[in-house]
Structures are given as structure tokens and as C-alpha cells.
């Protein structure tokens, strides 16, 4: 019996066609399987009823590459936070965020995260491994199937640092664009910034939306919040972002989590405005969602509005992004962290 080289979801249409022929089936069966995987939500060969029954039974053991929903938490705003169990038993987080005109999926790119941002729940659990591209695509398919609605937008803002898994993230982006049919500009890759990685992404000439988690207007404050930033001076990060704009023609979005009394004062806004002067950019202000592991607090509405107004006065495009699904522990890492004792039995220790 011919072995499957990889989970079927990880294979391109040409690869599926080649594989199915090694099992004695005609080439057109590859297209049928491809349609079952991406259009009909099949999770086993048994479900692919227009394929020969004897062949399906003979090859039923071949892996498809779909995760299993371990848990789902639903917030009053209808945001759904999923814990998905992978083939090796590890757990990742995925969030489905519905609105009147779109369905957005927040996907993870790694199991855990090595960045250890001290206000983030995911970083508290450490890094375990990179996700394969099909494990990223599976998250989008799962949300699409659960909501019975086409996914319009995907943001790489879940567990993990996407640029530390760049080859698989790019492969997933290409699949989501070319196979699932989501426009590149509706795909957002977010990073805390890593030396050399932003330029590597720029050289791919993707037309995705690119977001950088900035969170501070100066190097000293930034590296106190993001330990990995000590290896990447803020001035170099901003220079690489300018190079990204020049290479791709796409603006950079800066994400800025507002922490009460830490980085949310008018003086911080003024300093940030000076840093971003003349930059083709947009700033997303994100009021902090408190987690049990750390003592940071959310600013008041007045503080949030004051910070935004300072940036606006300097003619910097700014918006305030209120995280969805807070009641469901849906901010990055929170649901998984809230079940860490149970997950400890499932997750191998490094």
C-alpha cells in the first residue's frame, strides 16, 4: 500500500493528484479529494462518498490533517474561542469573530510563544513547536464550518510569533489566498519584530496587511515589556518597517496595547507621534485585557481617548480596537491559560 507522504490537507492539488495515482486511482480523483477537503469539510476519506467505497475503506487510515475541537467558549458578543487539539495532542487557540459584514479568524502560528511579552498570557506557557501550514489553514476551515459562513479575514495574532515560523506562515497565506479564496489584503501578519525577519517578509512581496506590536515609544520601555526587544533596537525596527513600506508599497500598522500608568500617558503619545512622523502607517490602540498572571490594568476611557487625540493632532491615523470575546477569555492565551492544569497533562514539558 502506498504511504501518504503527509496529511492530505498539507498537499497541494498537484501533490494530491500524484498521491492518489500511487494508490491506483485516476488523476481526477485528486481534484475530488481537494474539493472535499476545502469545500465540503471532509474529515476522513470515508466521508468522501463519490470516491470508490472499497478504495476508501482500504485507505481510511491515511491522515487528513484536521484538528478536533477540545473546547469552545462563547462570549455575549458571539465571539467564539476554540481550543483545538492537534494530531500530537497539543492544544492551540483559535478565535472566530463575527460582525455584520465579515467573519474574522484569529489564528495561531505556534504552540506557545518564545517572546515572553510580560503582559501576554500565551508567553507565560513557553514555546513548544511551530505549526505546519495545514495546521494554520485548518483553523480557518474549522471556524468557517462552525459558523456556516465564509471567512472574510484572517489575522495571525493568536499564539506564537509568525515571523519565527515564516516558511509555514507564508505557505498558509498562499493556500488561504489561492485555495480558500481570501484576498491577501484581508490577511494580516502581526509580529513583535525580529532582527532581519521583517526584511525577509518584505522580500516575499506579499500584499498582506502587516502589523507590528510596538507597545512603547522608546527602547527602554519597550524592552521592559517585551524582553526579546533588547536584541532589536527600536530605531532599527522602525528603519526595517520603512524599508518594508518601500519594498511592498504597503503601509505598516502599529499595534499599541495601552497599559494604565505604564505607556498610556500623553507624554508617551507625544513621543510616539515624533517617532512616526512622516511614516506611512496606522496606529491601533488596544486597551489592555487584564489576565490573572500579571498586575497590569486597563486605562480609563478618558485616558484612551486622550492618547488617541494626541496622535490624531499630529495627523497620525489612529483607531481604538476593543478586543472581542473578553468574557470568553478570548484575548490571546487567556482561555488556554485558564485551563493550564488540565492542559499540563496533555502538553509535554520542554
Swiss-Prot record:
Catalytic activity: adenosine(2503) in 23S rRNA + 2 reduced [2Fe-2S]-[ferredoxin] + 2 S-adenosyl-L-methionine = 2-methyladenosine(2503) in 23S rRNA + 5'-deoxyadenosine + L-methionine + 2 oxidized [2Fe-2S]-[ferredoxin] + S-adenosyl-L-homocysteine; adenosine(37) in tRNA + 2 reduced [2Fe-2S]-[ferredoxin] + 2 S-adenosyl-L-methionine = 2-methyladenosine(37) in tRNA + 5'-deoxyadenosine + L-methionine + 2 oxidized [2Fe-2S]-[ferredoxin] + S-adenosyl-L-homocysteine
InterPro entries, alphabetized: Aldolase_TIM, Methyltransferase_A, RlmN_N, RNA_MTrfase_RlmN, rRNA_lsu_MTrfase_RlmN/Cfr, rSAM
GO cellular component terms attached to this protein's record: cytoplasm
Locations listed in the record: Cytoplasm
Domain of life where this protein originates: Bacteria
Positions contributing to S-adenosyl-L-methionine binding: 160-161, 190, 213-215, 289
Family of the protein in this entry: Belongs to the radical SAM superfamily. RlmN family.
UniProt protein name: Probable dual-specificity RNA methyltransferase RlmN
Source organism of this protein record: Synechocystis sp. (strain ATCC 27184 / PCC 6803 / Kazusa)
Amino acid at each position: 500500500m502506498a504511504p501518504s507522504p503527509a496529511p492530505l490537507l498539507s498537499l497541494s492539488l498537484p501533490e494530491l493528484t500524484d498521491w492518489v495515482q500511487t494508490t491506483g486511482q485516476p488523476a481526477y480523483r485528486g481534484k475530488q479529494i481537494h474539493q472535499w477537503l476545502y469545500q465540503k469539510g471532509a474529515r476522513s476519506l470515508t466521508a468522501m462518498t463519490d470516491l470508490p467505497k472499497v478504495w476508501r475503506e482500504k485507505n481510511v487510515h491515511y491522515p487528513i490533517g484536521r484538528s478536533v475541537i477540545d473546547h469552545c467558549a462563547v462570549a455575549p458578543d458571539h465571539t467564539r474561542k476554540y481550543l483545538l487539539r492537534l494530531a500530537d495532542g497539543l492544544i492551540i487557540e483559535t478565535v472566530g469573530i463575527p460582525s455584520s459584514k465579515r467573519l474574522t479568524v484569529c489564528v495561531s502560528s505556534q504552540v506557545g510563544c518564545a517572546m515572553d511579552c510580560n503582559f501576554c498570557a500565551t508567553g507565560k506557557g513557553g514555546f513548544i513547536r511551530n505549526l505546519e501550514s495545514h495546521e494554520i489553514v485548518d483553523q480557518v476551515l474549522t471556524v468557517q464550518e462552525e459558523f456556516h459562513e465564509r471567512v472574510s479575514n484572517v489575522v495571525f495574532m493568536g499564539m506564537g510569533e509568525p515571523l519565527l515560523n515564516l516558511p509555514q506562515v507564508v505557505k498558509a497565506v498562499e493556500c488561504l489566498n489561492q485555495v480558500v479564496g481570501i484576498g491577501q489584503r484581508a490577511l494580516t501578519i502581526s509580529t513583535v519584530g525580529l532582527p532581519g525577519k521583517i526584511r525577509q517578509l518584505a522580500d516575499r512581496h506579499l500584499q498582506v496587511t502587516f502589523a507590528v506590536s510596538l507597545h512603547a515609544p522608546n527602547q527602554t520601555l519597550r524592552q521592559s515589556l517585551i524582553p526579546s526587544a533588547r536584541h532589536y533596537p527600536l530605531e532599527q525596527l522602525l528603519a526595517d518597517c520603512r524599508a518594508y513600506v518601500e519594498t511592498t508599497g504597503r503601509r505598516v500598522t502599529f499595534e499599541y496595547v495601552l497599559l494604565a500608568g505604564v505607556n498610556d500617558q500623553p507624554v508617551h503619545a507625544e513621543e510616539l507621534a515624533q517617532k512616526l512622523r512622516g511614516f506611512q502607517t496606522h496606529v491601533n490602540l488596544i486597551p489592555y485585557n487584564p489576565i490573572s498572571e500579571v498586575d497590569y490594568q486597563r486605562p480609563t476611557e478618558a485616558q484612551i481617548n486622550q492618547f488617541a487625540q494626541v496622535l490624531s493632532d499630529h495627523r497620525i491615523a489612529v483607531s481604538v480596537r476593543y478586543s472581542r470575546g473578553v468574557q470568553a477569555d478570548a484575548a490571546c492565551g487567556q482561555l488556554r491559560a485558564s485551563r493550564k492544569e488540565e492542559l499540563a497533562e496533555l502538553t509535554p514539558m520542554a
